[in-house]
Amino acid sequence: AVGATCVIKDLPGYLPMRNDARMNEMLRQNSNPLFGEENVFQGDHMTASTDMGDVSHLMPVIHPWVGCINGVLHSAEYEISVPDVAYIKTAQALAMTIVDLLYDDAVGAKDVLDNFTPALNKQSYIELLDNIAKGE
């Protein structure tokens, strides 16, 4: 109606998140006693983006979310509403998961690595980013 055009360009980075199922299960088992099983769940795909999505295409990772805030993410209204959960229980769950990965000569971490198939290798990741930046 106004004769305008619009060009949309993709920017490299922020690939979809690929949480490792084995590490997620370790974290779930460690979180249940701390938060209560009814408060721990596996989330579905989210529309939010993070550079951790890129990392997850190269190596096994998890990106847990803990519901202990009020307000909109990245806004002036964002605030911690349950400090014990934010600072203590979350750290405990993550620390217990690290122990599970490293205990007994890192048998848990070796299991995760042995069963992980990367979506990209270093070269294909760099090529993907270059192609996106070029508009291909």
Name each region found by the language model.
Residues 1-136:
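Metal-dependent amide/peptide-bond hydrolase catalytic core
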